[in-house]
Amino acid sequence: KLTIKDIVDITGGLVIGYPSAVVNGVSIDSRLIDKNQLFVPIKAKRNGHDFVSDAIRNGACCHLFSEGKPQGNAVKVNDTLIALQDLAKFERKRITGDVIGVTGSVGKTTTKDILFASLRNLTEVHVSKLSFNNELGLPLTILSAETSTKHLILEMGARGPGQIAELAKIA
């Protein structure tokens, strides 16, 4: 759990609203947001900033933004994707358990699933949902882990040169 002030300190953003409000989780999908989560609008095929009001209506207590006007509690940042990654880097430092990074051309998801199946009855383990193995999915996986996690299994995929190195900096 982070306060909005924590998010501002981590991202270098500017707070709009109540800095003491507590955020419990992060989502990039306004349809799937849970109560008191931080909504991070991402620019992709659709601009996530267009869905801030939906996220707030569905329970988000705060949102990041790099364009447009804030709605309720918000943090203004230069780039929402970089801010998401910065939050994940911060949270990763709070997780004291081991990180198992899975990379490769073929079989990443299968390997991740086998590792999870092998460890889940022995210890507290956290694993990515589906194939969350890119610059969005990896931070979301880290941000959804408990700080008490003993083994964090992260799948990392590359679409081009240097991408694994960038993901490793987050992990």
Positions of PLM-derived features:
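Phosphate-binding loop of NTP-binding sites
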Residues: 84-171
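N-terminal leader/targeting and accessory segments in enzymes
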Residues: 1-86
